[in-house]
Every structure is written in C-alpha cells, then in structure tokens.
C-alpha cells in the first residue's frame, strides 16, 4: 500500500508497551531508518508518525538516523529503541504470580504489528483488495480506525490500524499503586504481558509452572473473525497468532 502514516506509531508502541510489562516508565526514544534510496516525502511522513507516537507516549524523541544503503537493503527498514526507568526493586517480573490471581485485559486497536505473514496469505486466498471498502463492518466500541483515505473505510486501513499505546492507563495505575492511592498495592501488580507475536500464548511466559484461563474474554475485533473465516484458520491457531482484541 505504501501508506506509512501509522508505521512510526507501531514502532514506538512495540517498544514502550514492552517497557510497561516490567513496570518501567518510558522516557525517550531513538529511531533508525535504512532505505535503498532517499525519499524525502516518505521520510517526512514517517517522521511525523514517530513524533505523534512519542506525543501519545509522553516521551522525548531524542534522536535518530537515516541510512541510505543501496545494494544492501531493498525496502525501507524502520527500527527503534526506547529507554525507561523504574525505582530500584520495583520491577514487575511475574515471579510472585500465584494460582487464583486475576487477569485483567485491555482492548487492542487491531492486529498490532504481528501476524502479517498469515494475514498476507489469507488476503491472497480471498482475492479481496486492500484499497476497496472493507467486506465487513469494522465498527467496535473499544477502538477507532485511524484514516488515511477519504470515503469508505478500506480493508487496508483496518489491517494497518496503528498499535495502541498503553502508557497513559498503565503508568497512571503503577504510579497510584506505588503512592498508595491505587486500587491495590504495587506488590499486587504481579505480571504484565504485551500480546504480540505468539498471540495469547504470551501469557505462558509469565510463569514457569502456572497456566491461565480466561472465562470472560474481551469482544473479538471483526477483522479477526473475517480473517479466520476467509483463511479457514481454527480458533486455536488464531489465538496463537493474534491478540484477538486484547
């Protein structure tokens, strides 16, 4: 699609959301872009996307580099690194998890930068166009679609909807719990998982000997239902690949 309005947001989100999982407050970000040839217009779009993401995450865009590498890279490659901090001894590691602890899920905004190999295979099989109106109703109470086209919402816009940045709700929760004014003690925030590659199986990484059971899952986003149906992907594989709305 060559639509880069959301990729900077995805890049920052993947970094800061990972920091949150150990209880760290993100404070700064640097980016690196490698391209086969200079494209000022594309660079400007990505730069604006990175700046918007840092604004949402309340962090400083501390610097970055763009390298033109003909013969080494054939497509644009964007990467980044975020820096965060937490008080010594306040890291959240999951080692204190116990049987009976409660899982609280936060809604996702879409696919969240993972599972696109399977998405591309399903798209090829379905024959649907990314630039045409979405073949399903994308409305969902827990998210908005960030538009980069006018008119009907396209399938491409839904599948590229930027990753949600969770800094505001989680840092506020962590700070309140540390200050003794939150809904629980900081020691009761025992683990956090960023549902990325591997889907909900990421929860298994939180503890070596504990499993989990979600008896009241968040509503599944409509694009996941469409992908499962058009790709004949079973429920287990969908949950091992995608966040499914959480």
Would you name each region that the model predicts?
Residues 1-3, 29, 58, 65-68, ...:
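Glycine-rich, flexible loop/turn motifs
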Residues 91-155:
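Short, acidic (Asp/Glu-rich) active-site segment that either coordinates a divalent metal cofactor
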Residues 42-60, 73-76, 139-144, 148-158, ...:
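Glycine-/charge-enriched secondary-structure boundary and capping motifs
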Residues 23-25, 118, 188:
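Short loop/turn motifs at secondary-structure junctions
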Residues 1-109:
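Glycine-rich phosphate/pyrophosphate-binding loop regions near the starts of catalytic domains
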Residues 84-86, 107-113, 120-123, 163, ...:
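Glycine-rich beta-alpha junction loops
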């Amino acid at each position: 699609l060559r639509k880069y309005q959301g990729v900077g947001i995805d890049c920052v989100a993947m970094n800061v959301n990972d920091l949150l999982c150990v209880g760290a407050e993100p404070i700064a970000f640097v980016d690196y872009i490698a391209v086969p040839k200079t494209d000022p217009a594309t660079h400007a779009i990505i730069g604006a996307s990175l700046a918007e993401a840092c604004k949402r995450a309340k962090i400083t865009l501390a610097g970055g580099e763009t390298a033109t590498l003909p013969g080494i890279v054939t497509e644009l490659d964007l990467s980044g690194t975020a820096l965060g901090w937490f008080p010594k001894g306040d890291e959240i590691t999951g080692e204190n998890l116990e049987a009976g602890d409660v899982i609280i899920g936060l809604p996702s905004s879409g696919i969240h930068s993972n599972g696109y190999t399977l998405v591309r295979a399903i798209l090829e099989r379905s024959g649907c166009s990314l630039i045409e109106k979405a073949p399903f109703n994308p409305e969902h109470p827990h998210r908005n679609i960030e538009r980069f086209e006018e008119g009907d919402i396209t399938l491409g816009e839904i599948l590229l909807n930027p990753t949600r940045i969770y800094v505001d709700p989680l840092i506020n929760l962590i700070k309140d719990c540390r200050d003794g004014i939150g809904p629980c003690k900081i020691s009761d925030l025992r683990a956090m998982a960023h549902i990325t590659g591997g889907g909900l199986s990421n929860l298994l990484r939180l503890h070596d000997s504990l499993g989990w059971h979600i008896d009241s899952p968040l509503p599944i986003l409509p694009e996941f239902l469409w992908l499962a149906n058009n790709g004949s992907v079973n429920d287990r594989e969908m949950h091992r690949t995608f966040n499914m709305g959480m």
